[in-house]
Amino acid sequence: MPLAAYGVTHQGRRSTNEDSWLVDLDLGLLVVADGMGGHNAGEVASALAVQVIRDVFAGSGDIPREALLIHAVQSANERILTAAAEQPAHSGMGTTVVAVVVVDDRAFYTSVGDSRVYLWRGGRLTQLTRDDSWLAETLDGAGEQPQDIGTHPMRHVLTKVVGLRPELDATVSECALAAGDALLLCSDGVHGAVPHELLASMLASQKAVEDVAQNVVRSAMNRGATDNVTAIVARVAR
């Protein structure tokens, strides 16, 4: 089904931008990666992840695209580990990855880290992915939660990233798409600064996806985002 998509990134209040993103409508592929690591290693890791994922899909031949997501992310994991071993200054680098591939009327998606995919449909915004973070696991847990959970020093710690260790457990989920649906892929610079309700109202706009994506990033900046800020907005034609 016809899909329009557009991505925007901004370094925010950081000296460098360690986010990378990809919109490839020929492949139906959308990716956001938020890198981490010293000596500019974060931007190396995120750029490698995006490039490897795209290369896997571009060279897939007749393999169904929905079957490639896990292989693509695991290939990115291996490439980042190799690059870190070859360059000591990049040791310990890693990145989040959230990737969506649209095939006919379905979206297949995977996420590692705390970058997210949201689905907007009929006035409602739903977070499709679950953060791989201490905070998310604590909130989902059955035990007693710390009273200071909102300010806890562990709240931003990720439990899974691409490039951290050789074994990477990634899963693929899917959802049906309908005319008028919108997808938002974003780094934590967006969802950490912009309230869910405001994201929903911006995605409800009938403006072009370029304008909506720019508005999302601008809103994060206006609300004091301290991290790099990246958003991809995709919309299924009515």
Predicted segments, located by residue:
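PP2C/PPM-type serine/threonine phosphatase catalytic domain
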Residues: 1-238
